[in-house]
């Protein structure tokens, strides 16, 4: 899947799940399950409840996503 095919959205982490999975509420009030991208995992970026994040969603499954950026 190329980067052009992905949908980028903003959201807030509302819950931490096992295995570095997170429940994120998007700006449009939908709730999705997301995991950390490989570069964030490699650089030990910590994500906590309440952090604002940028997600990539695929058009095939809009209930799962990948966290690609954490805002302050």
Curated annotation (Swiss-Prot):
The highest taxon in the source lineage is Bacteria
Q: Entry's Pfam families?
A: eIF-1a
Provide GO CC annotations from the record: cytosol
Please state the protein's primary subcellular location: cytoplasm
Q: Where is the S1-like domain?
A: 1-72
Q: Which SUPFAM superfamilies does the entry link to?
A: Nucleic acid-binding proteins
Entry similarity comment: Belongs to the IF-1 family.
What is this protein identified as? Translation initiation factor IF-1
Q: Give the species.
A: Buchnera aphidicola subsp. Baizongia pistaciae (strain Bp)
What does the record give as the organism's lineage? Bacteria, Pseudomonadati, Pseudomonadota, Gammaproteobacteria, Enterobacterales
């Amino acid at each position: 899947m190329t980067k052009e095919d992905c949908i980028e959205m903003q959201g807030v982490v509302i819950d931490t799940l096992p295995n570095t999975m997170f429940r994120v509420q998007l700006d449009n009030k939908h709730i999705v399950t997301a995991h950390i991208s490989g570069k964030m995992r490699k650089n030990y970026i910590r994500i906590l409840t309440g952090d604002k994040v940028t997600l990539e969603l695929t058009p095939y499954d809009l209930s799962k996503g990948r966290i690609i950026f954490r805002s302050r």
